[in-house]
Regions:
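Metallocofactor- and cofactor-centric catalytic cores in central/energy metabolism, strongly enriched
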Residues: 1-187, 195-210
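Helix-rich catalytic cores of soluble enzyme domains
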Residues: 112-324
Length: 324
């Protein structure tokens, strides 16, 4: 018995088939809520059952969309030497993301600023192991309506590896940077050539809100690679048992995946593993727990089961202090 491999694969083949069967049952009988009229129109035009905001999926519809997802793609970088091949036989290391605070050397902390954001870009640029960007810190000293444009502009100024988009305005920056039209980017994505990536976050349980719906549609039209990463929390937004939370995550990923493939067949999609559990004393979300890692391993197994690339997070902790 390979102890290391077994620990990284908590599910048996029988378990994987059970998760898949439960997913098909939920998406077929409960469906998923899509809060965008445009998204529901796309589903209805393609023969999906739509009732109110809920869309229902047959096994054939899910399998057809899944089969069209690209199994490998090239993530283009502004520096051609930084371009990377994404496939089932390699892994890529990128930045963490979404931190609102910066910790100082004296262990105090402050709200992240524009300077912190640019410094984090420079650090990522200098590290050869880092291949892709993700917004490490969000500058709080900018109006919210300007933050995404500022972040994308400075990403292009200070980073020549693979870009991470922050919102819809990022597409315009990519078109200018690479001298391409949106249609050209879409066609190239179908051929496995991609100019950026973004994360799409469904809301547990079983909702893709209007912002994320519209974002997924626009990104698919532009051929942007998407990490579909819901964040079910066992015990609060998801059932308390780990298998149930895993099934819910699987439903949300596959249903969102279908939408992307209806728009651009072959559009690159990665299986995001972000499920976690709740601290039942405080009801807060716990991301550094053993349960979170088990769910992450199981999610990666499901991705391989569906022959999809996956994305996960490492180095997470719920410690109240740092040890530097």
């Amino acid at each position: 018995m390979n102890t290391v491999i077994d620990r990284l694969q908590p599910l048996t083949i029988d378990d994987l088939n059970k998760v898949d069967a439960a997913t098909l049952d939920i998406l077929g009988n409960t469906g998923m809520c899509f809060e965008s009229k445009e998204a529901r129109k796309i589903f209805k035009t393609n023969g999906f059952k739509v009732e109110g905001k809920n869309v229902f999926f047959t096994e054939t519809q899910i399998r057809t969309a899944h089969e069209s997802v690209s199994k490998k793609w090239t993530l283009m970088a502004r520096d051609p030497d930084r371009t990377i091949e994404m496939n089932m036989d390699r892994y890529s290391i990128g930045m963490g993301g979404g931190s609102p605070f910066m910790v100082n050397a004296d262990r105090t902390y402050h709200a992240a600023t524009r300077k912190d954001y640019i410094n984090s870009l420079k650090i990522a640029q200098s590290l050869d192991a880092i291949e892709t960007w993700r917004v490490l810190v969000i500058p709080n000293d900018l109006p919210a309506e300007n933050a995404n444009m500022y972040m994308m502009f400075n990403q292009i100024m200070h980073f020549n590896k693979v870009y991470a988009l922050t919102d819809e305005t990022s597409i315009d920056f990519l078109k200018i940077t690479y001298g391409l039209t949106e249609k050209e980017m879409q066609v190239q994505a179908s051929e496995g050539i991609v100019y950026g990536q973004i994360t799409i976050n469904p809301i547990t349980p079983l909702v893709l809100d209007k912002t994320m719906c519209d974002r997924a549609i626009l990104m698919a039209k532009a051929g942007i690679a998407m990490n579909i990463a819901p964040m079910p929390v066992a015990g609060t937004t998801a059932p308390v048992t780990l298998p149930s939370a895993l099934i819910l995550q699987n439903c949300e990923i596959l249903a969102t995946l279908v939408l992307t493939q209806l728009i651009t067949p072959g559009c690159p999609v990665a299986y995001g593993t972000m499920a976690s559990n709740a601290d039942m004393r405080t009801m807060g979300c716990v991301y550094g727990s053993p349960e979170s890692r088990i769910l992450e391993y199981a999610g990666a197994q499901l991705a391989r089961f569906y022959n999809m690339l996956s994305r996960g997070d490492v180095g997470l902790t719920d410690s109240m202090t740092s040890d530097f």
